[in-house]
Regions:
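Charged, amphipathic alpha-helical linker segments immediately N-terminal to NTP-binding catalytic cores
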Residues: 1-9
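ATP-dependent carboxylate-amine ligase
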Residues: 3, 144-145, 167, 264, ...
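ATP-dependent carboxylate-amine ligase catalytic core
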Residues: 15, 19-30, 56-144, 160-162, ...
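Hydrophobic anchor at the beta1->P-loop junction of P-loop NTPases
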Residues: 35-37
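Hydrophobic positions on the alpha1 helix immediately C-terminal to the Walker A/P-loop
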Residues: 45-49
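Beta-strand->loop->alpha-helix junctions that form or flank phosphate-binding loops
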Residues: 64, 184-187, 198-222, 241-246, ...
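Acidic, Mg2+-coordinating active-site environments of NTP-dependent enzymes
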Residues: 104, 124-131, 146-239, 252-269
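Nucleotide phosphate-binding/pyrophosphate-handling subdomain across enzymes
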Residues: 127-130, 139-150, 155-158, 168, ...
Length: 434
């Protein structure tokens, strides 16, 4: 398959190559309205929420998101369904031909972005929800012209590309804003002055959490549901949702603000019927047959949010265990150092087929932690041991975290599925880490 032959080009500091390939198809990215969602954390969940709400309202909806957990086609969905294999391969071959004719070499992410745009145009979608892969300014999805932009959070991640300070990271992410278009944004208060400078320069219309919209949880979780309050321009509104983790509140509020301040109107009753059925795999996802939660937190801020959620839902750390593994280049020491606040038992491993941190390094780090027990080993053995531990005593809970690639591997292992990708394809995919 062509994707397996892509080399590790990394990030192109510009949009010229993908722009030329898209021009070869008469710019399919301009054929549909779009919402573009950026953010250090929460952008994927917000994109999933928006896609579900538009779909429930009768819009033919495209969703472009990343990374995938099991099947690469998870990244390109139409009306909640993975792009069918025939359409995927057709779009991929077409993109490959144009790329080769132009003598260009797209990255893995750029190629899939072209495939997504072609698929959405050919399916005549009414709207596309586009999750930014990395940053914003030079992200392949920024070749589109979104009607609404969203920024879900700003924290330190990918600093070697985006910059070492929050101000630099904000500038990269806020570059997705469009002149005269709403920009729904959440970021730390101390960045307000920097944001104002960017707003004046780029000319977008700011819709800020804490100013134009806000909200709060209205109830604790009960039977897998939780209520939240949304406050926009009008009266407060209360909705129930199946996304119950405390850190998911901002994602829900951001999606609600898109519907209020964007050009589309979806009735409250449609929203109220859709939110209780929402699911977002790999983010506070409970397995149905095991006391196991999957959460792909993969940077210090998202890990702190996960720990707060665990402590709220499962306050006894002696009953909480972790199956954890991390990708090189991430601040794994800070992440692993946070976890003992919520649990005491650790199964340390490496996400398979990735450039992972050696589990022995994790063990060495954990060795100085008092009050914690840990074991270390290959993925299969640690998964078996961790799942067995979770079922030995009633009330125990196992949390799988550290990388979305680890979460995806557990989903395949737990369901008995083998990867639908060849070893070569997995190696290519592993160079683009969540």
């Amino acid at each position: 398959m062509f994707l397996a032959r892509l080399t590790r080009h990394g990030i192109h500091p510009g949009l010229d190559s993908i722009g030329r390939v898209l021009s070869g198809f008469n710019n399919p990215q301009f054929s549909f309205p779009a919402v573009q969602v950026a953010g250090t954390n929460g952008k994927g969940t917000t994109a999933v929420i928006l896609a579900a709400l538009f779909r429930s309202a009768g819009f033919r909806t495209g969703l472009f998101t990343s990374p995938h957990l099991v099947d690469v086609r998870e990244r390109i969905q139409i009306d909640g369904q993975l792009l069918d294999p025939t359409s995927f391969l057709t779009c991929l071959r077409d993109a490959c031909r144009v790329q080769e004719r132009l003598g260009l070499s797209l990255t893995f992410f750029e190629m899939l972005t072209v495939v997504g745009f072609l698929a959405f145009e050919r399916a005549s979608v009414d709207i596309a929800i586009l999750e930014v892969g990395l940053g914003g300014r030079w992200d392949a999805t920024s070749t589109a012209r979104p009607d609404v932009s969203v920024l879900t959070s700003v924290a330190k991640d990918h600093t070697e590309i985006l910059g070492e300070t929050l101000e630099k990271i904000l500038r990269e992410k806020a570059a997705i804003g469009r002149v005269g278009k709403p920009f729904i944004a959440t970021f730390p208060d101390h960045l307000r002055d920097e944001w104002s400078l960017i707003e004046k320069k780029r000319g977008f219309l700011s819709v800020l959490r804490g100013r134009e919209f806000d909200g709060a949880w209205a109830s604790p979780e009960l039977l897998g549901k939780r209520s939240f309050i949304y406050q926009g321009r009008a009266e407060k509104k209360v909705f129930q949702t199946a996304l119950v983790a405390r850190y998911q509140l901002n994602n829900l509020l951001s999606a609600m603000a898109v519907l209020e301040y964007g050009p589309w109107k979806i009735p409250d009753e449609v929203i109220a019927s859709a939110l209780p059925t929402l699911r977002n795999p790999g983010r506070w996802e409970r397995l149905p047959s095991f006391p196991v939660i999957l959460d792909g937190a993969h940077n210090p801020e998202s890990m702190r949010e996960l720990v707060e959620q665990i402590r709220e839902a499962f306050p006894d750390p002696e009953r909480v265990g972790f199956l954890a593994g991390f990708i090189k280049g991430k601040d794994w020491e800070e992440m692993l150092g946070i976890l003992p606040e919520a649990g005491r038992t650790f199964f340390l491993t490496a996400p398979p087929d990735t450039d992972a941190v050696d589990p022995l390094q994790l063990a060495s780090f954990m060795g100085v932690r008092k009050g914690c027990s840990f074991s270390v080993g290959q993925f299969d053995s640690m998964s078996v041991n961790a799942f067995e531990w979770s079922g030995q005593v009633p009330g125990r809970i196992l949390v799988v975290t550290g990388s979305l690639y680890l979460v995806g591997a557990v989903k395949r292992w737990q369901s008995g599925e083998t990867s639908p990708l060849s070893a070569g394809e997995r190696n290519v995919f592993s160079s683009f880490h969540p």
